[in-house]
């Protein structure tokens, strides 16, 4: 495990900002500044530049500006910022960036990209040279770009610092106490606070005025795979976007303050956010690094590379880091890799590894006898997809663990005394001591999962009346749409609530929570069986919200099933194949919001609609909950009744957690759209099947692309 501290002449995010904005379509930032070199410098012909201008006007000017000046978060391709970043950079890097344009890449031929490069150089003051070979991106990869700076490097730094300082200097250090009980104005974690309740005490936007919400600002983003979770502190929004890029944004108006992009050769993968603690931002990357950045400048402080035994393939960092005290905890997903996933804890100041908890126990360890006698080299899964929850009083961090895809060897138990096929700690809640990584308790919600029906999502810490006492509980739902409540201190089973969308579990023991499996759903490669819920999950990645004032939990659900049998695609190794199927009880609906009274263990209300719910649910003290769907509608509901009080059509699918915050006495509502994920793609396919069967139109109007949308109320009239 390696941790590197990095210092550079110019902090990369500041230099990246300069007088330019962040790139929304592609990252026009070379990976390193070129040192003085005797390498050849590229040149171009006037003919190339003239042709390049025509191509630029047609294909690029609408985003990057007629004069290459950029707009909003689309970068400029000229001027001081561009010159500083690209002077002396390898031609190969410019070629890579150009070939990704327009968004989606590959729309122009190689000659067109060469002519575009020539025009960009010409616009930046580099003279054509007819006595040298024309620019040839494919043949001149070892060449360097010419100097375009004219000694402007120092001026750029001072200009940037002056532009961002006024907002960034207001940032105060984030403490454990703030993460446990954030200032009302802030949204400091993926689900706002350590308890993951997804609830804000802000109430300026309420039932009476929510219909007056209007767009305050919109920032375009680069399209790509992402599950973004904005966090806001002291008027600054920190946003992790595609590809592996952190933005610091003025939360009042959407102005970019700084930007940091992690460069790697690995294709950027979807993430669920970043973390704040002290004066640092903690970032997971697609090539298995965890970074610490300065919250005020974006400067890299340390870089920890997570070591694996078999390289990077098959591993991912999906969740936001989770910080408690002086430990930065990061879950690792391991899809089909021997020995499975784990949680690692890093020292907050140095990035050095402190402890590691393996989610699949080794033979001879507690739980090691639950893998049907398989050697550790044949055990896989146990991914950690989501950030944890933390209770300060109990000093326990709670995580969920995913199942394995290698289900075949576990399907039937072996006849060996002391060996079972439960497959710990898959589908379990694990409670860890954050200081040592010691396992304090665990509870397995569904043993020997043969259907990819994860119980891997957010753990929420709540306090509710139960059995004549006030109990602190950890609650979560799995893909089946069954909620389990456990005692937070001991893991003792309390109760379950079934949303009625599944047929796999036929009975739940009221004392232990043990789930009896319906024998008609056990995988059989020779017989097609209807399995509900789908492995996409009735409950999945979008987190729920809990209102502590009313003891109500608000859950986003989607109704769907699978046919498991001899036809379809092979996800698991039991021999069955899977094909999408509709829920026979859908009655023309697929999306659902369920309100649960956890104090009474009763259903409060239910809202159903045709389109799947795609975003998180967010609750506020204004008596509202918010949710967004696949048809690009963002809605506000009355938390008491489920009545729709406001809705607006977005220009793309709301694919993030919904958050709220306040700056200078004004409450804002924010959501990101247009950055896709497994979840969005899966339910888009399910909805297409559903709409076709139900004869419903599909919203196929042009999409506006990835962006952050922020709403607020109109100014009050005096």
Task: Name the predicted role of every residue range.
Residues 38-39, 106-194:
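Flexible coil segments in periplasmic/lumen-exposed cytochrome c-class electron-transfer proteins
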Residues 187-191, 223-245, 266-290, 314-340, ...:
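Repeat-blade elements of multi-bladed beta-propeller folds
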Residues 330-341, 399-423, 559-586, 674-700:
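Short, conserved, GDST-rich strand-edge loop motifs in beta-rich repeat architectures
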Residues 52-67, 116-120:
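The canonical Cys-X-X-Cys-His
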Residues 42, 46-53, 67-100:
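Gly/Gly-Pro-rich "capping" loops immediately C-terminal to redox-active cysteine motifs
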């Amino acid at each position: 495990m390696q941790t590197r501290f990095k210092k550079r002449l110019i902090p990369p995010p500041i230099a990246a900002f300069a007088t330019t904005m962040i790139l929304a379509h592609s990252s026009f930032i070379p990976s390193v500044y070129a040192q003085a070199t005797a390498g050849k410098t590229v040149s171009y012909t006037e003919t190339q530049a003239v042709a390049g201008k025509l191509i630029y006007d047609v294909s690029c000017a609408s985003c990057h500006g007629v004069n290459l000046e950029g707009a909003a978060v689309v970068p400029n391709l000229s001027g001081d910022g561009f010159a500083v970043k690209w002077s002396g950079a390898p031609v190969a890097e410019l070629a890579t960036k150009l070939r990704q344009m327009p968004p989606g890449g590959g729309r122009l031929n190689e000659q067109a990209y060469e002519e575009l490069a020539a025009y960009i150089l010409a616009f930046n003051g580099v003279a054509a040279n007819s006595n040298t070979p024309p620019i040839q991106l494919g043949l001149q990869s070892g060449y360097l770009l010419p100097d375009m700076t004219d000694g402007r490097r120092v001026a750029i730094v001072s200009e940037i610092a002056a532009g961002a300082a006024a907002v960034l200097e207001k940032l105060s250090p984030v403490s454990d106490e703030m993460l446990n009980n954030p200032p009302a104005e802030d949204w400091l974690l993926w689900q706002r606070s350590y308890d993951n309740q997804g609830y804000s005490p802000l109430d300026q936007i309420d039932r009476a005025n929510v219909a007056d919400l209007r767009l305050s600002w919109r920032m375009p983003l680069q399209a790509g795979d992402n599950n973004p979770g904005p966090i806001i502190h002291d008027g600054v929004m920190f946003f992790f976007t595609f590809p592996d890029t952190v933005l610091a944004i003025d939360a009042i108006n959407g102005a970019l303050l700084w930007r940091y992009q992690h460069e790697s050769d690995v294709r950027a993968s979807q993430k669920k956010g970043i973390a704040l603690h002290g004066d640092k931002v903690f970032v997971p990357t697609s090539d298995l690094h965890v970074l610490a950045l300065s919250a005020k400048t974006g400067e890299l402080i340390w870089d920890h590379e997570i070591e694996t035994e078999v390289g990077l393939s098959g591993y991912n960092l999906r969740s936001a880091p989770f910080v408690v005290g002086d430990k930065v905890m990061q879950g690792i997903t391991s899809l089909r890799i021997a020995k499975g996933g784990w949680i690692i804890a890093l020292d907050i100041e140095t990035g050095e590894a402190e402890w590691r908890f393996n989610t699949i126990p080794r033979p001879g360890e507690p739980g090691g006898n639950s893998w049907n006698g398989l050697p550790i080299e044949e055990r896989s899964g146990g991914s950690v997809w989501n950030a944890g929850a933390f209770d300060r009083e109990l000093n326990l961090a709670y995580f969920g663990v995913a199942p394995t895809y290698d289900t075949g060897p576990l399907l039937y138990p072996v006849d060996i005394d002391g060996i079972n096929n439960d497959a710990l700690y898959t589908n379990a809640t694990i409670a860890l001591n954050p200081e040592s990584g010691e396992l304090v308790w665990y509870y397995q919600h569904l043993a020997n999962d043969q259907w990819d029906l994860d119980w891997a999502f957010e753990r929420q810490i709540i306090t509710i009346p139960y059995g004549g006492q006030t109990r602190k509980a950890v609650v979560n739902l799995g893909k089946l749409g069954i909620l389990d409540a456990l005692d937070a201190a001991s893991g003792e089973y309390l109760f379950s609530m079934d949303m009625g969308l599944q047929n796999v579990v036929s009975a739940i023991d009221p004392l232990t929570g043990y789930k009896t499996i319906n024998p008609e759903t056990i995988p059989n490669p020779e017989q097609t069986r209807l399995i509900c819920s789908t492995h996409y999950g009735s409950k999945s990645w979008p987190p729920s919200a809990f209102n502590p004032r009313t003891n109500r939990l608000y859950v986003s659900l989607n109704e769907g099933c699978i046919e498991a049998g001899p036809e379809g695609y092979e996800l698991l190794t039991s021999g069955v194949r899977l094909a999408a199927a509709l829920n026979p009880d859908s009655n023309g609906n697929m999306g659902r919001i369920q309100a649960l009274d956890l104090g009474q263990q009763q259903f409060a209300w239910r809202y159903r609609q045709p389109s799947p719910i795609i975003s998180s649910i967010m609750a506020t003290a204004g008596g509202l909950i918010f949710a967004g769907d696949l048809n690009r509608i963002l809605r506000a509901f009355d938390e008491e009744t489920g009545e729709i009080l406001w809705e607006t059509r977005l220009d793309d699918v709301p694919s993030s957690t919904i958050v709220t915050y306040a700056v200078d006495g004004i409450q804002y509502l924010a959501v990101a759209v247009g950055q896709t994920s497994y979840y969005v793609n899966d339910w888009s396919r399910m909805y297409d099947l559903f709409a076709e069967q139900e004869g419903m139109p599909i919203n196929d109007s042009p999409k506006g692309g990835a962006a952050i949308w922020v709403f607020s109320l109109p100014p009050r009239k005096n």
